[in-house]
Amino acid sequence: AIYTPSDYAMGFTEKRSVVTNAAVHKGQNYVFNIDLKDFFPSVEQGRVMKRLTLNPFNFSPQIALLISGLCSMRVKREQPIETKQHDLDKQFMYVLPQGAPTSPIITNMVCDTLDRRLAGLAKRFGLRYTRYADDITFSSMHYVYSGNGEFTKELARIINTQGFVINEAKTRLQKLGSRQEVTGILVSDKLNVTKKYVREIRSLLYIWD
């Protein structure tokens, strides 16, 4: 079977990019960005294995265990856990490695439910929603982004129940009239790149010349 990421996943899939991600949010009064903390290491082998046993893959548990193991790496837990299994299980866990070529598409697979629930939340509040890897964006013509409001509380609840944590340091609300940026693309009026990006490209061209 061929896997196709959700309509809201804009990264690491054919015919989608930072540009198509940004285009969804062009010309909105409010652009709300959040980041998922430690995105790839947050996905443990067990979650990958379970996903591989579901549609459209339907692998046997044995095959799913093998594939998920090949795509994971062992890391030490910050806090050992209580378990009846081998002592190593108390100290270590197996997670998706940052930078591995397999990790991005696997996170898209694992995040199917997250995308579906966040898209449902967006529809409920009349918002636009996309996700590019760990970079989540909502936008709208109206304001619903109060820190203690119903939308933000439900947003945090959904993300936490899906095994992720919001990186509060990277949360930002951008209003029309200020610089609105989505995955490095300016979206206030028309799609454009930032001056910083232009400077970086010029520097690279100078080095290569």
Residue spans of the language-model regions?
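Active-site-proximal segment of RNA-dependent polymerases
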Residues: 1-40
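Glycine-rich, flexible loop/turn motifs
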Residues: 8, 92, 169, 178, ...
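Residues in well-ordered beta-strands of folded domains
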Residues: 11-13, 68, 174, 186
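Short capping/connector residues at structural and topological boundaries
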Residues: 17, 101, 178, 187-192
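Conserved polymerase palm-domain catalytic core
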Residues: 24-133, 137-165, 171-175, 209
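Flexible glycine/acidic-rich beta-alpha junction loops that bind and position SAM and/or redox cofactors
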Residues: 174-182
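Active-site and adjacent loop segments of nucleotide-processing enzymes
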Residues: 181-209
